[in-house]
Swiss-Prot record:
Alphabetized SUPFAM superfamilies for the sequence: Ribosomal proteins L15p and L18e (SSF52080)
Protein's UniProt name: Large ribosomal subunit protein uL15
Coiled coil: none
GO biological process entries: translation
Record region (Disordered): 1-51
Natural source organism: Thermomicrobium roseum (strain ATCC 27502 / DSM 5159 / P-2)
Gene expressing this chain: rplO
UniProt keyword terms in alphabetical order: Ribonucleoprotein, Ribosomal protein, RNA-binding, rRNA-binding
Domain of life assignment: Bacteria
Record carries keyword Ribonucleoprotein: yes
Amino acid sequence: MKLHELKPAPGSRRPKTRVGRGIAAGKGKTAGRGTKGQKARSKVRPGFEGGQNPLYLRLGRMRGFKNPFKIVYEVVNVGRLNELPYEGVITPDVLRSFRLVRENGAPVKILGDGDVTRPLHVQAHAFSESARQKILAAGGTVEVIS
């Protein structure tokens, strides 16, 4: 068998339908477009809704993107830590038990709003520079956990 002898399998190819070529052809007269109306007479562009403001204009554009690597911290200020009736090492679990942090498993960041009047020993996932300075100035310790 040679290349010029190849043929498609019987019944695998259908001839192209020629529309609008007389009633006897089966697709004559309206050529499968139905009767009357804009779609019967000419093309209608995709998304056209008859003059009504189309969906893609009603919804507006979505700009920018969402960073899949963004870390969203649960934040606690040092002023709130100072008020805690707790003397041990302050960890995210301790903060959850005192309901200063909501989400389980979310990383905790300590921010520097408020005053520290006693030595605090704090473990958290992140500290702001002002929080770190206030805790250390009061004689406490900061430890970054992962």
